[in-house]
Amino acid sequence: MSLLSKFKNDPLFAKVMRSSGSLFSNNTLALGLSVVQGIMATRLLGPAGFGLIGVVMAFASTVNSIFSFRMSELVVRYGGEYLNKQDKEQASALFKAASTTEAAVSLLAFLVVLFTAQFAEIYLAKTPDIAWMFTFFAINLLANFNIETSTGVLQITEKIKLQGAVNLIQAIVTTLIIAGAFFFGGSIIVILVAYLIGRSILGLGLFILAQNQLKEKLGSGWWRTPLSKLTARKEIFRFAFSSNISATIIKLFRESELIWVGFFLDTTAVGYYRVAYTITHFLAIPADPLIATTFPEINKLAVEKAWGKLKSFLKKITAFSFAYNIAIGAGLILFGQWVIQIYSGKEYLAAYPALVALTIGLVFNYILFWNRPLLLALGLPEFPVYVTLAAGIIKLALSFWLVPVYGVAAAGGLLSFYYIASVGMMVLRGIVEIKRKEER
């Protein structure tokens, strides 16, 4: 049997590809619109203005992640198991706990942004009289009060493709507003409003879709189920706490790059880095649908203790992701300067060294995109915490020395180091654990 036949005849791989393909098609259209948004916003605002918007948006997201419990992972891990066992009572209690906790965290995050906006203005944006922007954009945290739980529900009910439809709608609305600002001389405020409306549409849209799925699967009164019906409260709390710590570490060391660049340099440098970061994250477009659709399948195989099938599945999705990530990565490195000029103009060519550095680490990360979901499915939620913390501390320590001297290229290189070190260790740990369980 040929390699291609093995892929085509694997029903699990085919199922994941179908679900990912549906989500990918909508996300591809949304990506095209986000490119158009970037083309207009970079030219309208210039590097400093584009960087300022990036810092404002990243600050709200980072504060939220510090308190976030990554409810989508908890919902997939335990909600998926309960639904598979037709244990609707425990599933209802879990979804209720996840929803209320996430809503409380979103409110807390908004209040933290409100009280720290002045600090962000002085030390991160380094631009006078813009503290209100941080508070204004943080309204999206309230609109996204249940986005993680909703995403998890759509994953385990196999309706994740609907996320792509909502994402496309918000991309269309955001693009139309930015286009109006671009052609009619709008200000940075209009751009900020556009992104706020887009984020709000995504959060509220997913919430409505998830509620419909919960009513269909559990009945209209699912939310009345008392939390006391959860029997594995200690285990669930351990998972949620570990996910919270892991999410905080990941956000501080990996996904808050614009904030750190703003802290070490200025908003112009943030503008350059944001362009490089945005372009290289085109790699995430095919990867994100795969992550969303493979985690539930990995979790199912782990629950069933089907270790042979799990290894075969991981090999297939890794081979698939290797092929397209290497191709896209090589294209970004070879034609990166040309891509930057098309996306944002010659004014942003200083972003190219950072683009090259970031591409290397992101290609490695997205080839092995299943690293953390595998450990969660294997019951090892703490291991990613230790690894990401160690790699993150080293990265941050080196940043104080290298970024002020070598600029955005050093920032990109250090993030790549973080990806390679942390992802590599998590993959090795997952493989070792599968072998250990097979030998039992």
Where are the regions that the model predicts?
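Interfacial segments at transmembrane-helix termini and the short loops linking adjacent helices
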Residues: 9-16, 117-137, 267, 308, ...
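Hydrophobic alpha-helical transmembrane segments
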Residues: 131, 135, 165-221, 390-394, ...
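Interfacial/gating helices of multi-pass transporter permease domains
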Residues: 41-62, 131, 189-193, 231-243, ...
